[in-house]
């Protein structure tokens, strides 16, 4: 664990923030390159991703703060301390989708086509971001002396759920890229992403120790994952039956 990478004068470079920036840079570069291949202005893609990145972080933070409101009411200034971690993917997804629709509507572009273009690279960005979680020590797993690693901030040997999540997201990225290079209907890549992400998150949640049980032995994110799985499955079935 390395929550702090280094200090430059009075400024501290935090691993979590650094990984978020790296995730944005790498995903934007690769998405822009893919846009050129599809004869789409890469500047539009970069601007879209920047807008989605900012809105996604805000949405993810708001969702996380609401989920842990009692803790943040005790120390409100922690709400803006992103260097300590604390982003909820589901809030980021909701905000990111809304931001994408608004931006693409303004630009009068095909919404599903562009989302299909960028979504594999957002999965890659998530994979990189989870490395930041590992270095920061957030999103941690349950105690496991046999299969865990030592987290100094928790003074315990825990399951490295961040690492598992990062690797699974990398696999999702590879699958989506393979599908992207084959003929597909608009929206299909996006729904496949959700279909793959949902069981991934459900599994990881079963190993995590930082999210409370809310209903019948399941965490809130497991319940949301089940809902997203069936919504994405319905979306894929609809696209399969839809005439070109």
Task: Give the positions of each predicted feature.
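A feature for loop-to-transmembrane-helix boundaries and adjacent hydrophobic helices
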Residues: 1-244
């Amino acid at each position: 664990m390395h929550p702090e990478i280094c200090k430059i004068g009075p400024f501290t470079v935090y691993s979590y923030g650094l990984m978020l920036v790296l995730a944005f840079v790498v995903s934007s570069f690769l998405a822009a390159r893919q846009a050129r291949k599809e004869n789409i202005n890469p500047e539009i893609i970069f601007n879209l991703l920047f807008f989605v990145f900012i809105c996604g972080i805000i949405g993810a933070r708001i969702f996380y703060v609401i989920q842990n409101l009692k803790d943040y009411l005790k120390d409100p200034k922690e709400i803006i301390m992103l260097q300590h971690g604390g982003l909820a993917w589901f809030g980021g997804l909701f905000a990111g989708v809304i931001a994408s629709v608004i931006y693409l509507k303004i630009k009068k572009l095909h919404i599903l086509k562009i989302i299909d273009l960028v979504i594999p690279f957002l999965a890659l960005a998530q994979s990189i971001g989870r490395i930041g979680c590992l270095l920061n020590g957030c999103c941690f797993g349950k105690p496991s002396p046999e299969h865990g690693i030592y987290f100094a901030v928790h003074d315990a040997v825990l399951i490295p759920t961040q690492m598992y999540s990062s690797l699974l997201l990398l696999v999702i990225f590879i699958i989506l890229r393979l599908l992207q290079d084959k003929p597909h209907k608009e929206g299909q890549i996006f729904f496949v992403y959700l279909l793959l992400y949902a069981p991934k998150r459900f599994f990881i949640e079963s190993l995590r120790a930082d999210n409370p049980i809310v209903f019948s032995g399941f965490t809130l994110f497991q319940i949301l994952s089940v809902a997203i799985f069936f919504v994405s499955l319905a979306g894929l079935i609809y696209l399969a039956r839809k005439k070109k």
